[in-house]
Structure formats: C-alpha cells, structure tokens
C-alpha cells in the first residue's frame, strides 16, 4: 500500500503548489440573509456527459445529494461542454449552459444564487465560469461561486486522506488519472 500512497502524494504535489488561500474570502450565510420576497437557488455546474448510464451514477447522484442537503432551496444544473450540449441537442435533449441557466433563474425571480461547480481544480473551466457569472451578477442581489474541490492547500490533505482510507478498505487496485490543465 505504501507505493500507492506515494503515487497519490506524487500526483498531488504539483497541483498543491498552485493552491490558493482563503485570504480574500469573507464568510457569510447566503441563505440566512434572505428577505421576505427573496428567492434562493443553487446552480450546480457540470462539464456534462452524453452517456445516460454515467449521468445517472454521477451528475444525477450529485444533484440528488445537493437537494437532500438543502431542502427548501431550488436546485438546478447547467452544463459547460459545448460539444456535449450540441450532441444532446441532436438527440432532442435540451440542457442549459451556465449563462442560460442564470438568465432563466433571473426571469423566474430568483435573487440569491449559490453556484457550485463539480470541477476539481481552479483551472480554465473555473475561470471561464467566474467570468460568465461576473457578467450577469447585477441581475441578482447576491450571487456566489463556490470553490472547486482542490482549491486551498488543506483541501489536498483532506482528499489524500479520503483516498488513502478508501484504498485501505478496497480489495482491488485503484487507478487515478488527471486531465492536463494548461494553467
């Protein structure tokens, strides 16, 4: 198991060097600040998939967990991959991109939006999402974008611990891969 632990740690050394700190964040309760006429929603941002079986096990499962964790708050989704959105549209399946979803939420009277992406790192996809949100932020009283899974240095330690514990309980080998990021 030590060689697997070493591999996991090695995989995370590079990204840890790019981690961010929380110095620029102010903690406050988005949903606790709602007025009588305010409406809140959570918008989950996914890259997307064209495979229904995969979607059920991943995206739909995440959405369901979010709805369970935040009862009484509207939970929506948006997908970022233009290629996937195009392929789905050709099959007659409509999904919204983040801009479309935010416009729809605004038109439906939502005032407070929490956006959480399923991206792993603060890379190109997250930067693009933050730009899109910034362009529409004046439509809402409060709109916030949550950090990706691996953002601050301590996030890496939590993930390495979870992976290590999962490996210790597994009877099989686990393979970890990463998509290259140019930033």
Each language-model region and where it sits:
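Sec-dependent N-terminal signal peptides
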Residues: 5-13
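Boundary at the C-terminal end of the N-terminal hydrophobic targeting segment
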Residues: 19-21
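A structural feature that tracks compact, well-ordered secondary-structure segments
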Residues: 46, 80, 89, 94, ...
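Extended intrinsically disordered, low-complexity coil regions enriched in Ser, Thr, Gly, Ala
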Residues: 52-78, 126-138
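Short connector loops at secondary-structure junctions
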Residues: 73-90, 150-151
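Glycine-rich, highly charged phosphate/nucleotide-binding loops
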Residues: 91-104
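Hydrophobic, ordered structural segments
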Residues: 102-156, 160-166
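Conserved small/polar residues in nucleotide/adenosyl-binding loops
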Residues: 176-181
